[in-house]
Amino acid sequence: MESEQMLEGQTQVAENPHSEYGLTDSVERIVENEKINAEKSSKQKVDLQSLPTRAYLDQTVVPILLQGLAVLAKERPPNPIEFLASYLLKNKAQFEDRN
């Protein structure tokens, strides 16, 4: 019986070659998913470079720019360019995921 348990333990170690470093299967899956997502995002960035100008702008700048211009028109600040620049910088994180 003990030999069967040892074999089972050895089988588990063999299934996870990085267990000696303390990596669990779930951590390995997370790492693999991150690698896949990184590859997809790099492919997407390449795709952005190959887009026509209008499509590139529509996917990258237009969404945040329209929202910023809407707020600008509503608030009508005395320094609209600085206001818009500040708005874009403050809110860029919301839109970076989409690029």
UniProtKB/Swiss-Prot annotation:
Residues 1-26 are annotated as: Disordered. The modification N-acetylmethionine is found at M1. It is found in: Nucleus; Golgi apparatus, trans-Golgi network. There is a cross-link at K35 (Glycyl lysine isopeptide (Lys-Gly) (interchain with G-Cter in SUMO2)). InterPro entries: Dpy-30_motif, DPY30_SDC1_DD, Sdc1/DPY30. Belongs to the dpy-30 family. This is Protein dpy-30 homolog.
